[in-house]
Amino acid sequence: MGVAASCLAVQFEQKTAEADSQGLTAEQALRWRSAIRTTLFVPDPLPPLAVENHGRFEPAAGVVAERVSYATQFAMRVPAIVYSPRERRRELPALIIVNGHGGDKYCWYAFYSGVLYARAGAVVLTYDPIGEGERNSQRKSGTRAHDTRQEPRQMGRRLGGLMVTDLMQAVSYLSQRADVDPERIAACGYSMGSFVLAVTGAIDEQLHACVLVGGGNLDGPDGYWDNSKPMCQGIPYQSLAFLGDRPAAIYALHAMRGPTLVFNGLEDTVVAIPTHGKSFFDNLQDRVAQLLGTRKGVFEADFVAHVSHRPFFVTEPVALWLERRLDFPLWTPETIRAMPTTHISEWVRAKGVAVDSRYASEDREGGLRALGAGVPGLSRSQLSVFTEEQWERQKGRLIYETWVRKARSRITHRQ
């Protein structure tokens, strides 16, 4: 632990004890949010968005997709696809998809979500995490380039902070759109994305609702998340030890922000759900309530038996939960329950859609019954923000290697 992190640990040990005895106050929550941002080097204030528009297309009947990019740390850019209903109206709810390891805006559940929820009347943003898609030096997907261990250890804190910054900038981008209701912005995070969203949802009060799937089972010292991928999860999570009971503190901050759902398959061995079980979540909810001094706003947890790692935000139960929080203009609970479903393994074969072989099995993504039907298989050329020539000119502002160089140049001994 660095000097700054050690100071935070001492400072917050007393504050955690105060929160336990008095209930978490707005002042204490503000201190925690500020400390999380400082620890992970999340800029405060965030960089100017400097939004650039790169064209649009219609991926499906009644749906428009915009190619955009926005700024993140060090004047770098995040390429994104933004889906919305073709018939424009003001004050729409909005949704952000936060990918799992190896995922990006090209992966099936990202664009499926975009089309699905645009049909519901929402604006949906999908983007490339650092090291994937158009932020990869070879413009490839599924590379997991950011998993390469970078020294010193502070680089892990900085990478976690970059991922949080990317997501916070997505929230800011949506909140300034004329067609988005800034009070109805939600995000859904899958696997690695569940961790990124767990942290972001604790500090970004612009988010109204959060859905964590294939994860969200934040545990204690030397648990699954401390020992998971070090650069994007393990080191960032360990660095938040100053919070004391990290899971309870993070979810208490969620409760003060808005509703949160954690949704998992009970056989999800990817993120160790079987070794946690339902009782783990019951206990965590109790600890959050104790920290808050009330059960109001404590996160919800739900499960599906006999299945493993899946992006459940494209399924009926999560869509119904989102409908209650966002009030989709073109859906009701009754229309959601009446919708057909799509067997993903059959759909990817029929449409020629790529899926990570590690997750293609029936107990994982392949067996998922996604809400809706008739979602097309979109191509890489459709989902690219830049042409190859444009990307070659822009890549210095996009790729992981540039970020590593810029981040390392900012490291000081005391950090």
Stretch-by-stretch model annotation:
Residues 2-66, 71-77, 277, 281-415:
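Alpha/beta-hydrolase-fold serine-hydrolase catalytic core, especially in secreted/extracellular enzymes
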Residues 169-243:
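Primarily recognizes the serine-hydrolase "nucleophile elbow" in alpha/beta-hydrolase
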Residues 128, 188, 213-214, 263, ...:
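Alpha/beta-hydrolase-fold catalytic nucleophile elbow
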Residues 220-285, 289:
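The feature captures the conserved acid-bearing segment of alpha/beta-hydrolase catalytic domains
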Residues 90, 96-165, 222-224:
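Cap/lid segment of the alpha/beta-hydrolase catalytic domain
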Residues 103-105, 132-135, 194-197, 217-222, ...:
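Flexible loop/turn segments at secondary-structure boundaries
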Residues 91-94, 120-123, 182-184, 205-209, ...:
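Loop/turn elements at helix/coil->beta-strand transitions in domains of secreted/extracellular proteins
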